[in-house]
Structure formats: structure tokens, C-alpha cells
Amino acid sequence: MASRKEGSGAAGGGFGSAKGKGKAAAAGDSAVKQVQIDGLVVLKIIKHYQEEGQGNEVVQGVLLGLVVDDRLEITNCFPFPQHTEDDADFDEVQYQMEMMRSLRHVNIDHLHVGWYQSTYYGSFVTRALLDSQFSYQHAIEESVVLIYDPIKTAQGSLSLKAYRLTPKLMEVCKEKDFSPEALKKANIAYENMFEEVPIVIKNSYLINVMLWELEKKSAVADRHELLSLASSNHLGKSLQLLMDRVDEMSQDIVKYNTYLRNVSKQQQQKHQYQQRRQQENIQRQSRGEPPLPEEDINKLFKPPQPPPRMESLLIAGQINTYCQNIKEFNAQNLGKLFMAQALQDYNN
């Protein structure tokens, strides 16, 4: 069970699978092709962040539902309560079990299908999230993690994405070997660590009718304010976070290059040692003396420990996420500039 710290979630190892009438996925294929979320679940996640989320502190919770064929239906959720390290008596597993037992008593879907987490400017590609999602998927194959971005949502566009670990990454995590050779053999790169699952938000017919009536009653206001450029604080913060991750990547590259230099240096030392031994044996043979006894060269020259490369892959994935966010932000603002210029030219 993963501890609930920033960027982590509680694993679902102690709960039963949510598989309903769906069939098991074939080896190497994703068990979930689509995520269907009730509108009530989306509102609960947003409400949870508004009540307890502050700054870069994340909020997390449990997703409940069931699996039908290759579709994961999320019908309910409940939050993890905020607590500090001083709350030594708080038991997350017991809390989750009591919540799910209470939901079962009132005939609400109580099967564990994943977890959700808020993010701060897209900062969610972390080792804590990787470990938590691996625990979920290892226990319940169909589990997903929902990433909610409150900053993008506040700008007028709901940002809610579902992710799963790819089968390749699941195998690597099971082996717990994150050496450069193991990741290269598994062909793991930051592009194929996570897979995004399409999301469909479903509402009841009555809610859809109510939304349609509200849309009809809403007064038509001046829409020119929609062309206002977004705050530059968003771009500045994203660039600052991007530079921080680039610095971390640079430090990891220096460590890896140091490891490669040490390996090369040791190979040269081993080669020189073997040549000296060979020349000395030739001289001893010419003098009629027995050759030197065989020695385990690996004991004399212990290979340097390779640095784990998983952190570098996660940093690269986070850098890619920041770049995509900056790209979307700039594309929206450039579009607004062109539209504003066209309107100004038209009015003139």
C-alpha cells in the first residue's frame, strides 16, 4: 500500500476486481479501451479540489464503478481526507474499506476501479504516481488514474484525462530492474510509458434536458471578452517548471556520462592487466617456470553500479508534458490575436 504523500495514491491491492461481464484482455493488449464517467463524478472531483486543494498541494480519491467489455464505467468516487504526518492513528486501508462497505449498504457501486489526483500546471509524471498506478494495475488489471487540472479548468475548458501504464512498463516494474540495459532491452522510452484512454462523460436524460433548457434561457452577451489573452503568469510558471526539469535532466545526464567514463576506464585497466599477465607468463615459460595461477578478473575489477534510468524517463516525460501545455497555451493565444485583428480590420 503506497503512502499518501504529494503525487502518490493508495494502492488497491486489498480490494476485489471490478470486472463484470467483460472478457480478459489478450496478452500485450490494453484491458480498457474507453472510460465512461458519470457527470456527478466529475463534479465531485472538482468540488473536492475547490474545498481542500491549495496551491501546489494535490487532492486524491478513489474511483468506483465496473467494467463492461472493454469499457470502464466510473459511477462514483470518494476523496482521501487531508491529514498530516502527525495523524499516526489514521489508517487509509481501514478508511477505504469502511467507505466501500457503507456504499454497498446503500446499493451504490462499490468496486474499486482506480483513483484520481489533481495536478499543478501539469506536474504529475512522478515516481510516486508510477508506483501507485503500478500497485493498482497489478492488483486490478482495469485500473486507471484520472488527472484533473484545475488551472486549465478555471480557464474555461475541463481538463480531465485518464492514464494507464503500458504493458511494457508493467513488465519492467514487475522485474524491478531499471538499469539502462533492462530499459533498452524492453524498448522503454518516455513516449510509451503511459497510455491515455479516451474519456466520455455521460449524463442522465433528465440532466441533458435541464442543460438544454438552461442554454436556451441564457442571455446572449457580448462575446468579445473571449478574445482576451490569458494571463502571462500561466506561461511564466510553466516555463519556470520546464527549466527546473531541464536542470534535473542535465544533472542525470552528467551522472550517466560519469558512469560511462568509469566503465570505459575500468575496461582499459582490465585490458592492461591482462596484457601484463600474458607477457609475464611468456617470460616465466621461457625460464621454465610455471605460469601464474588463474584469477577471477571480475573480483579484481568490480564493475561500477549503473545509475537507475527510470527517473530520467519520468523527467523526460514531464518535460514533454510541459512542452505540450506551453504549445496549447500559445496556440490559443495566437488564434485570439488573429481573430482580434480580423475583427478590428472589419470594424475599420
From Swiss-Prot:
Gene Ontology CC terms = eukaryotic 43S preinitiation complex; eukaryotic 48S preinitiation complex; eukaryotic translation initiation factor 3 complex
SMART domains associated with the record: JAB_MPN
Cite the Pfam families for this sequence. Answer: eIF3h_C (PF19445), JAB (PF01398)
Keywords on record = Cytoplasm, Initiation factor, Protein biosynthesis
The MPN domain extends over 35-169
**Which cellular compartments is it found in?**
Cytoplasm
Principal subcellular localisation of the protein: cytoplasm
Q: Which HAMAP family match?
A: eIF3h
Q: What's the protein name? A: Eukaryotic translation initiation factor 3 subunit H
Species whose genome carries this gene: Taeniopygia guttata
